[in-house]
């Protein structure tokens, strides 16, 4: 179905690459050195698809990072474009502050020292 790889010179300097995606891209892919990558918009839509189903901490973490570049409305718009028959905007706004499933999930190693409690508060402030 898919595969994960850690790419880098050693354990402390690496990134995780997941190859799990089989759906057609809705947003144009990005091509770097003849390698096709999903766009940020595509990734954001995928993250909201997971959040719509309960979400994991890493998905909230990733969306929180995307909020440095995009608005919450932008990110929800990417999801709706990708999933026109999926969750509504109001349903997503409810899910983006429902941390019940993610609460028991492992806490990602954050290289920016972000805190889970602050991330939750930021989402709650955005949805108010």
Please report, for each region that a protein language model flagged, where it lies by residue.
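Compositionally biased terminal segments of proteins
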Residues: 1-128
């Amino acid at each position: 179905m898919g595969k994960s790889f850690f790419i880098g010179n050693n354990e402390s300097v690496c990134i995780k690459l997941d190859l799990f995606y089989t759906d057609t891209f809705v947003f144009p892919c990005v091509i770097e050195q003849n390698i096709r990558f999903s766009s940020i918009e595509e990734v954001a839509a995928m993250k909201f698809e997971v959040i719509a189903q309960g979400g994991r901490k890493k998905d909230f973490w990733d969306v929180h990072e995307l909020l440095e570049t995009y608005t919450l409305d932008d990110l929800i718009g990417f999801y709706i474009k990708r999933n026109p028959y999926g969750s509504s905007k109001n349903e997503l706004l409810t899910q983006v502050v429902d941390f019940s499933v993610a609460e028991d999930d492992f806490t990602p190693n954050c290289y920016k020292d972000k805190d889970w409690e602050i991330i939750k508060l930021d989402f709650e402030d955005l949805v108010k």
